[in-house]
Amino acid sequence: MAPAIGIDLGTTYSCVGIYRDDRIEIIANDQGNRTTPSFVAFTDTERLIGDSAKNQVAINPHNTVFDAKRLIGRKFQDAEVQADMKHFPFKVIEKAGKPVTQVEFKGETKDFTPEEISSMILTKMRETAESYLGGTVNNAVITVPAYFNDSQRQATKDAGLIAGLNVLRIINEPTAAAIAYGLDKKQEGEKNVLIFDLGGGTFDVSFLTIEEGIFEVKSTAGDTHLGGEDFDNRLVNHFSNEFKRKHKKDLSDNARALRRLRTACERAKRTLSSSAQTSIEIDSLFEGIDFFTSNTRARFEEVGQDLFRGNMEPGERTLRDDKIDKSSVHEIVLGGGSTRIPKVQKLVSDFFNGKEPCKSINPDEAVAYGAAVQAAILSGDTSSKSTKEILLLDVAPLSLGIETAGGVMTALIKRNTTIPTKKSETFSTFSDNQPGVLIQVFEGERARTKDINLMGKFELSGIRPAPRGVPQIEVTFDLDANGIMNVSALEKGTGKTNKIVITNDKGRLSKEEIERMLADAEKYKEEDEAEAGRIQAKNGLESYAYSLKNTVSDPKVEEKLSAEDKETLTGAIDKTVAWIDENQTATKEEYEAEQKQLESVANPVMMKIYGAEGGAPGGMPGQGAGAPPPGAGDDGPTVEEVD
C-alpha cells in the first residue's frame, strides 16, 4: 500500500509525519530538524528551500520569500495583505487582483504566486519524507487553519497539486491537534476538549467532544492573521524605535538591518519563554553602529498587550456558539509554538478559572501528528486498531449563503454545521417576467452582503415569463469534507440547471495555470538537481586536487618521487586550484574536464609509485559528499585507502 503523509504547512515552519506500525513518526529534514522553515530563497545560481533559505535571509532579504500562508487565497487589496507588505523585505505586486511575489532569480525578474511558493515548501516536505521512507510518496493530508475560508482552502489544495501531491483531504489544524491528543487516551464516556492553536501566523480555537474514537467538532473560531510573527513585529518596531532614539538613525528602510533585528527579536522571544530576561547584541547593525540592549518578559508582554488580550476573544466565542459553560471543559490542549509563551498559558489558565492546560503533546508537532493519522485512515490503512476506531466530524467555519433582494445575506449553511453537508432552499423571482436570476454566493456572518466575502456568482437564464414569485428556483449548496463548496441551481418549471464553477473571480487558479505551474515546478526541480550536480563536480575536483597535494607532501611518497615528477605534479595541482578559484560558476562538464586533465598528469606519476596494486593514497573519497559525479575520472586507477 502506498504510504500517505501528513503535512502541517505552517506560516513560519512546516512539519511532516507518517503513521505506520501503530506509531507516529515525525520526519527530520536533511539538517536533522523536525520542523522546516517555510522559506524559499532565490539567488543568482540556485533556489533554496527551508533551513538553507532562512540561513541566508540577512544577506539576500529581497529575494527570500516567507509568510506565503498570509497571502494564499487572499486578494491584493485585503487590509491584512496591505499591512503585511509593510513588513516584507521582498516585493509583492498585484496580478489579476491577487498578491504575487516578485524576485530576482538567475539574473531575471520572476513572479511567483503564493500557491507556487507553498508548493515549493510542500515539495521539500515530500522529499524529506521520501528520503526517509526510501520510496515515492504521492498521497498527503494537508492542514489549514480552521478559520481559512473557501478560497484559502482551495488555493492550499492547488499548491498540493503543483507539488505533485494527491491531496487526500484538507483538514483543520486544531482538529489534527485533537487527534494527536486523543489518539492514546482511552477514557470512558464523552470528553469535552478545547483546542487552543496559536502558531507563527494564525490562531484557532476549536471545541470538540471525543468519545470512543469519534472526534466531533462542535464549534470553531479564530483569526487567520494572528501569531508569533505579530509578536516579532511588535518587538522589531519597539527596538527600531529604541535604536533611532539612542543613535538618531532610522534603520526602518534598510532590509538587511531589519532582518538581522527580526532574527534577534525572534530568538529573544523564544528565550523569554524560559527566562525572565535576555539581551540582544547585534554587531554593526546599521551604518557601523553596534546595537546592545536587554529585554525582559514584562516588557515583551507590555509591547504585545493588545495581541495577548485578543487571544481570548475567539475562545469566548467558541464556547458561546455552542452554549458551553467553562466548567464543563474537561481538557485544554495547546497547539502551535506560540503557546509556549508563558503569558498565553497564563491567560488560558485564568480564563478557565485556574485550570492548567494539557502539556503532554509537543505543540510544534501536534498538527502534523494528527494529519499523519488522518492520512493513514484516508489511504485505507486498517493495520492499526487505533486508526480503525477513529471518525472525524468537522464543521464549516463560516456561514454560506446567497444574496437575496436588497443585498441581504440568506444563509443556507450556518457556521459550525458538521461537514460534509448538503442543503437546498427554494427561491423565486423578484420582478414580473424576469428571464433569469443572478446567483451570488457569499461567506461570512454579517447581515448585508456588502460586508462579507463574495465567493463567486453565476447566471440561471431561460426562465419562462411569469409573474414575480411564481418560478421555483431550487439552490443547493454541497460542502465537502475539505470545506470546499459546489453550488447548483435548478428552475423547476423548465428543468434548467446551472452550477457554479468558481474561477478567478475568487482567486482560484485555472486548470491551465496549475498545469503551467506544475511544469515550472518540474523545471525548477531539474535546475536544482543540475546545480547540485555542478556543486558535486566542483567539490569532487577540489577534494581530488587537495588530496593529491597532501599525498605529494607526504614524506613516504616524497622519497619515491623524482624531482621532475614532483615539479610536474605540484605545478598541475596549483594550476587546478587557481583555476577553481577563478571559475566558481563553471559548469559540471568543465569541472569534470578539468579533473580529467589533472588525472592525466597525476595517474602516470602515481602508477610509478604504487605500481598496478593501488590508486592514489587517500585519493578521491568514495561516491558521496565531496566525491566527483559518476563518470568523472573513470579512466583513472581505482581509489583505495593506502596506509
Curated annotation (Swiss-Prot):
InterPro entries referenced in this protein's UniProt entry, alphabetically: ATPase_NBD (IPR043129), Heat_shock_70_CS (IPR018181), HSP70_C_sf (IPR029048), HSP70_peptide-bd_sf (IPR029047), Hsp_70_fam (IPR013126)
Gene3D superfamilies found in the cross-reference section: 1.20.1270.10, 3.30.30.30, 3.30.420.40, Actin, Chain A, domain 4, Substrate Binding Domain Of DNAk, Chain A, domain 1
Pfam families: HSP70
Keyword Transmembrane helix found: no
Keyword check for Transmembrane helix: no
Biased composition (Gly residues): 612-625
Residues covered by region (Disordered): 612-643
SUPFAM superfamilies (alphabetical): Actin-like ATPase domain (SSF53067), Heat shock protein 70kD (HSP70), C-terminal subdomain (SSF100934), Heat shock protein 70kD (HSP70), peptide-binding domain (SSF100920)
UniProt GO MF annotations: ATP binding; ATP-dependent protein folding chaperone
Keyword list, A-Z: Allergen, ATP-binding, Chaperone, Nucleotide-binding, Stress response
Domain of life per record: Eukaryota
Family: Belongs to the heat shock protein 70 family.
Name of the protein in its database record: Heat shock 70 kDa protein
